[in-house]
Structures are given as structure tokens and as C-alpha cells.
Amino acid sequence: QPLVRHSYQEPVETYSTNIMGTVHILEASRRAKSVRAIVNVTTDKCYENKEWVWGYREDDPMGGHDPYSSSKGCSELISSAYRRSFLEAEGIGMATARAGNVIGGGDWAQDRLIPDIIKSLEQKNVLKIRNPNAIRPWQHVLEPLSGYLMLAEKLYLKESDVSGAWNFGPNDEDAKTVKWIAEKLNFANADSVKSKKY
């Protein structure tokens, strides 16, 4: 379940999907003779939110202040436990991949900045932006995806020990504010998006 606000509305569904879903996938994978590598893609929201200025490191504590984030932290812990308890002994490579603020690729889910801007343009509505000055590590979906595929290949070929957790993100200087993204999309369109903070 990939949506933060939805996790507040449906916490049981969120935990059931993200926690037990992970358990069921890993259990099925370890019993399938053909599986040789697993990459569980979670999120950069899996960390205990420290509100500090630098990026999180792979060995920082898991946490989360909301059902979505904490469920993804749990998925990470489950993956680590399965890797150590079962998968390593069975020769299955296991890694988790964490990326945040991925854009592009046809993601039209609710509460996604770029789709919300496009919808507001089409419907000529005022867009409500929660936190316009928040700085986010924006990246196009193909950027982390190429990393996930490379990680899966290395796990499969056993080229090196890449099992464990991996963060995928842009360089620090490429992180931009929500407002910056909204303004760039406004500039690209003949109509402007009127936005207000809420």
C-alpha cells in the first residue's frame, strides 16, 4: 500500500498489505526452487524520522510516525530476518532498495505532486500544496529502476556480496523544493496553477 494519507484512513489494510504481504512473498520465494535473487523495494520513509539536514544511511534505525512509514520499516526488518534466517543458507540473494519521491512512469495515484498539478490544470482548480518549501530528492522512475535491476543482476550472478539494504537517490544538489517543481510545471503550461498552502 503506497500512500501515506490512505494509511491513516486504512491502517489495518496498510499493515496487512505491507507487512504480511512481505512475509507471504518471501515465504513463497524461499520455497520456490527457481528463485535465486530477491529485491524488496520499500521507501526512504522507512527510517525513524530525525528531521536532520543530511540523508539517511542504510544502517540508520527503522521507524516511522505513520502507518505507511512504519509498515515499510517493518517490511525492511522482515526482509533482513528472512535473509539471515533462511535465504542466505539456501543461496538466495536478498536486498532491499529504498528510494523516495520517484516521478514519472504513469503514476497517477492520489497525493502525487505532478499528477495533482496536471489534474488541477485540466480542471482549472486551485491546487493545495501541503509543504511548498519542503526539499525532496526527486528522481525519475527509470533512475532507481536501473539501479534495482543492476542490484538484482548482481544478486543473481553472485558477483559480489550486495545483500542487505541500499538507498537510491539523486545527488544532494539535485534535491529541489516542492515549490520549485510546481513552478517549473506552471512555466511549461500556458495556464498557471494557482496554489495555496494548507
Segments (PLM) and residue ranges:
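C-terminal structured domain segments across diverse proteins
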Residues: E58-D60, S71-K72, G93-M94, P115-I129, ...
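C-terminal substrate-binding subdomain of Rossmann-fold SDR/epimerase-dehydratase oxidoreductases
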Residues: N101, L121-Y198
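N-terminal Rossmann-like NAD(P)+-binding domain of SDR-like oxidoreductases, especially those catalyzing
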Residues: Q1-A99, E183
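Residue-level signal for the nucleotide or nucleotide-sugar donor/cofactor binding architecture
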Residues: Q9, T17-M20, D66, W108, ...
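A short, amphipathic alpha-helix embedded in the catalytic core of nucleotide-handling enzymes
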Residues: I25, Y82, L113-S120, G147-L151
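A short beta-to-alpha transition loop/helix N-cap that caps and shapes the active-site region
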Residues: E48-K50, G106, K176-T177
